[in-house]
Amino acid sequence: MIPAVLLAYFWYSVWQAGHENDRRRQEAHDSLLRQARAAADRTVGALDESAAGGNGGADVLTGVIWEHTGTPVISYDEERRVFTAVGLRSAEYTEEMQLFGGGPDMVQRCFVSSYVRRPGAGWTSTVTERDIEACGGSRWIESSVRFVRKAMEGWEADDQWTRAGLQRVLDPVGQADDDRRFVVRSVVRRGENVVAVVLVRDTGLGGGSGSEGAVVEQCYRLQRVLGSPGGVVEPVTAVPVVVC
């Protein structure tokens, strides 16, 4: 009798822990959805302010969206006048101990946010959750931009800050055009500021959405400040842009 009671209690504990973990996982997911919607609401307010101030260029508005969402891929459909931001969000939670483990875990969700301004009205947003695979390219772009920033921070150009020079730094092998992860569009130095515009691409080699046949790409404007006091290299800033 006792073994049967113990066995029943054991399986009840397993069921209860599983039920609690499902609840915590769903709670983490719901928090991500709330975060995505809150970010979209903040962005709409910022877009309205930018438009009211006369700053309505596509690159400016892209920067506003990026500032309030941190989304690595932001596209603009000029015909429909719609900005679309694709990005991954993640949240940690703690699972109850079970037969096969427990402890810290993470949920990830892919969100697509669209921003449109109708004639005579303000900006509006729509947030949609997509399959995690839809954010593969966005995740790859985000990782690649970090690489470009680090490469620019370590770039010693001996005052020859050129497009070809940065292209060699980012692509020393010289890949074929279709396979290039990075295409340097321009490098301009004004005083101690070096500004580069780089097209960052997921061609599918990184396992992102490009592996399904579509190339995901995003232009970024990167800036490095030279000659910092004490020889300290200032972090390179990177902001997505539409015009490349």
What are these regions (language model features)?
Residues 1-13:
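Hydrophobic membrane-insertion alpha-helices, especially the h-region
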Residues 80, 103, 128, 212, ...:
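Residue-level signal for mature regions of secreted extracellular proteins and peptides
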Residues 90-107, 201-216:
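Short, cysteine-centered beta-strand-loop-beta hairpins and adjacent loop/turn segments enriched
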Residues 78-82, 114-122, 187-192, 224-228:
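A short, structured loop/turn motif at beta-sheet edges
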Residues 108-110, 191-193, 217:
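Extracytoplasmic
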Residues 15-90, 97, 133-188, 239-244:
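Extracytoplasmic low-complexity, Pro/Thr/Ser/Ala/Gly-rich segments
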Residues 104-143:
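Contiguous hydrophobic, core-forming segments of folded domains
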Residues 199-244:
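Extracellularly exposed regions in secreted/surface proteins, prominently low-complexity, repeat-rich
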